[in-house]
Swiss-Prot record:
Cofactor(s) listed: a divalent metal cation
EC number: 3.6.1.-
Name of the protein described by the UniProt record: RNA pyrophosphohydrolase
Motif range (Nudix box): 47-68
Main EC class the enzyme belongs to: hydrolase
Record keywords, A-Z: Hydrolase
Family in the record: Belongs to the Nudix hydrolase family. RppH subfamily.
Entry function: Accelerates the degradation of transcripts by removing pyrophosphate from the 5'-end of triphosphorylated RNA, leading to a more labile monophosphorylated state that can stimulate subsequent ribonuclease cleavage.
GO biological process terms on file: nucleoside phosphate metabolic process; ribose phosphate metabolic process
Length: 168
């Protein structure tokens, strides 16, 4: 059995979707093993990069698969890949125990559509499993307090990097 410390990170993207008022999309997670309590169930869209896919293409795909949103403009990306470890207590169940956490490339995107474009109940034209049960717009600086604690350092970095883009 592979030791936790020797497991690789899953390569992913994260998206800060910013509306015209400078607020950021967050979704309430539909459930899963990452949950630690009912307070920290909100997050921005994120997901894995497929083999041969570049991070920007993955970001657009994941955003559509989780929110149905296609009306976006790229504002910025964080140069570094940000990582977090999942707690050992869930590492054996998350991603079938193959990863110790995630390595993420983060993008800031301007949402250019109308709120009616967002569909978290039947995302991606109804062809994808719902990741969120509801959503809202939130000031970016509030997000680190709404995320599961083990992702908080990543969200703090994202909030710092994208603060001027999101009205902060």
């Amino acid at each position: 059995m592979t030791r936790y410390e020797d497991l690789p990170y899953r390569t992913c993207v994260g998206i800060a979707l910013i509306n015209s008022e400078g607020l950021v999309f967050i979704g309430r997670r539909a459930g899963g093993i990452e949950h630690v309590d009912d307070t920290h169930v909100w997050q921005m869209p994120q997901g894995g990069v497929d083999p041969g896919e570049d991070a920007w293409e993955a970001a657009k795909r994941e955003l559509y698969e989780e929110t149905s949103v296609r009306s976006v403009e790229k504002l910025a990306e964080i140069d570094d890949w940000l990582t977090y470890d999942i707690p050992r207590t869930v590492a054996g169940r998350a991603w079938k125990g193959r990863y110790r956490g995630q390595r993420q490339k983060w993008f800031a995107l301007r949402f250019t559509g109308k709120d009616s474009e967002i569909d978290v109940e039947h995302p991606g034209g109804g062809h994808h499993k719902a990741e969120f049960i509801t959503w809202r717009w939130e000031p970016l600086q509030n997000l680190p307090t709404l995320i599961v604690p083990f992702k908080r350092p990543v969200y703090e970095r994202v909030a710092k990097e994208f603060a001027t883009l999101a009205g902060g």
